[in-house]
Amino acid sequence: MATTASNHYNILTSSPSIVHSEPGSMQQATAYRDAQTLLQSDYSLQSNSHPLSHAHQWITALSHGEGGPWSSSPLGEQDIKPAVQSPRDEMHNSSNLQHQSRPPHLVHQTHGNHHDSRAWRTTTAAHIPSMATSNGQSLIYSQPSFSVNGLIPGSGQGIHHHSMRDAHEDHHSPHLSDHGHPPSQHQHQSHQSHHDHSDEDTPTSDDLEQFAKQFKQRRIKLGFTQADVGLALGTLYGNVFSQTTICRFEALQLSFKNMCKLKPLLNKWLEEADSTSGSPTSLDKIAAQGRKRKKRTSIEVSVKGALESHFLKCPKPAASEITSLADSLQLEKEVVRVWFCNRRQKEKRMTPPGGPLPGTEDVYGDTPPHHGVQTPVQ
């Protein structure tokens, strides 16, 4: 078998030309087709009734790790080198092959004339056990037609691309299988669990309504005001809430988002208040933690009449007048000042927007004479 292959190999290498290429031509040489015709005619049918070439069996044997009969023969390598390294000598004799007949079933379609005219194709490369370019990758590959195409000497442009892609995918497939899909499943499961957990923690409107009702009942039973709760929250948790906020929470007048935020704080305050409700000073301690408000001042009727008479004379007294009036009425200076401020605000509320009430100009005594009643223009 090796002898027969060697004879055909010598016939192929003794062919006057292997490659035919002209700069302005869109067709390739016929030497490759003639050589292929020779191989197909000699090895037309095998035992499995497929017209497979003998070269394909050698390539298949090499791809499965079987040693080729020429792998250890230095003579074969010496015979191969002239065919690979001297394409120019073979191209000069291409004019003799132009008039040869071309079988219609072996017409080769080119992809364009953008390839170098030095590109060569030969089936003798199918018998080569291994050929490596400068980057050390094999140039032998098989296609459905069991031929070798696109081999350019001294460069790696003819390397089979999908074999490199397969090697690249095989190299990266463990990485993708180990670090690609399982983390995405883990992230998806963690995200799903977090989403379920957040749905369980979010109360419904019915839960908020029931909690607000229970909170108000327990707060009143413990003796705390809404202001006390707001101040206690500021002392315990750092967030001071006004009495209006607690009132709106109990009346379900806050937004759903704010109700959800305030509910756990009020729940903790209830637990804290229940744990300290046994001591007699628990209410005083929580109340003392808040703001200190001044005691409301109550003024007697006689003192209030004296202030009213002074207000009619001078609604905005000076600081010296406020001091003397406070001493005469035995009141604090701040109390007298605040009373006059409140009285002026009350007067503004009582005065209509169109102007002062009739007769108030004479009372205050600061209205100019020409601002009296105007006569209509005739």
UniProtKB/Swiss-Prot annotation:
Source organism of this protein record: Danio rerio (Zebrafish)
Keyword Oxidoreductase found: no
Function field: Transcription factor that may play important roles in patterning the embryonic brain.
Q: Which Pfam families does the UniProt record give?
A: Homeodomain, Pou
The protein's GO terms of the molecular function aspect are: DNA-binding transcription factor activity, RNA polymerase II-specific; RNA polymerase II cis-regulatory region sequence-specific DNA binding
Q: Which UniProt keywords are present, listed alphabetically?
A: Developmental protein, DNA-binding, Homeobox, Nucleus, Phosphoprotein, Transcription, Transcription regulation
Nucleotide-binding is among the record's keywords: no
Tissue/organ expression: Predominantly expressed in the central nervous system, with strong expression in the cerebellum.
Q: Which residues form the POU-specific domain?
A: 200-274
Residues modified as Phosphoserine: S279
Q: Where in the cell is it found?
A: Nucleus
Residue numbers of the DNA-binding region are 292-351
Q: Which GO terms describe its cellular component?
A: nucleus
Protein name (record): POU domain, class 3, transcription factor 2
What GO biological process terms are annotated to this protein in UniProt?
A: brain development; endothelial cell development; regulation of transcription by RNA polymerase II
